Regions:
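N-terminal accessory regions of nucleic-acid-interacting proteins
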Residues: 1-45, 83, 130, 202-230
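Conserved DEDDh/DEDDy metal-dependent 3′-5′ exonuclease domain
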Residues: 24-29, 33, 40-44, 53-176, ...
């Protein structure tokens, strides 16, 4: 692994991230068809979701409200509203996330997987939670030892800027801001970049940890799919 020490991460130059021109908002049937073709051609994709935050006691999240999938060259954002199950995006999400041929990589994906299952009935397959996989390689049980910020610092020598102000914005809004779009796209795209770097520079460790992570994710209890109204 990189020699960057955790206490120097905040002094590193910023991670530049994905460009706005490389982000696709999937809204129409044509957008969905293009996204499906591009993503199904990938061997691995970056993956994350965003949900509108809940602030009141007892309030139940209706997320995810945004699903982000990234190839090496682009990020695709799918807005998941109340009628998402019948939207053009739903078919893409089912086909890509349930495909056993595509590895899905991200950080801290437990809630994302549960919410996708509850809202859309998606059983995501071949998942690598990089926070778990990288922690296993390092031989530490420290829960937050390998978040995206730490991985970017140690692998790329850059500082990943995570704005809490953007994190807690309304992800259910029909019109996302440019800041929201870039933040969300980066979350998925940087996960794939980290996965590629890990596989290229530490192939044996990556292969073993990835196999264990996929096995654990696929063995997780599966809830019954929600019944859609007739």
């Amino acid at each position: 692994m990189s020699e960057v020490a955790p206490d120097t991460e905040d002094t590193l130059p910023p991670y530049e991230g994905i460009l706005l021109s490389e982000v696709r908002l999937v809204r129409s049937s044509e957008d969905a068809e293009a996204a499906m073709a591009a993503l199904l051609a990938c061997d691995a994709i970056g993956f994350d979701t965003e949900s509108k935050p809940t602030f009141r006691k007892g309030e139940v999240s209706t997320g995810p409200h945004l699903v982000q999938l990234a190839s090496d060259s682009h990020a695709y954002l799918f807005q998941v509203g109340a009628n998402a199950a019948s939207s053009p995006a739903a078919a893409v999400l089912h086909a890509v996330l349930e495909s056993p041929a595509i590895v899905k990589v991200g950080f801290g994906l437990g809630d994302d997987l549960r919410r996708l299952r509850a809202k859309l009935g998606i059983e995501t397959r071949n998942v690598i939670d990089l926070a778990t996989a990288l922690r296993a390689v390092q031989g530490t049980s420290e829960r937050n030892a390998w978040g995206a910020k730490t991985a970017v610092a140690r692998f790329f020598g850059r500082r990943l800027q995570k704005s809490r102000r953007i994190t807690t914005t309304n992800w259910a809004t029909p019109r996302l801001s440019e800041q929201q779009i870039l933040y969300a796209a980066d979350d998925a795209h940087v996960a794939l970049r980290i996965y590629r770097h890990w596989h290229e520079h530490f192939p044996a460790a990556a292969a073993g940890a990835a196999a264990n992570a996929i096995r654990a994710a696929n063995a997780a209890p599966r809830a019954a799919k929600p019944v859609q109204p007739g």
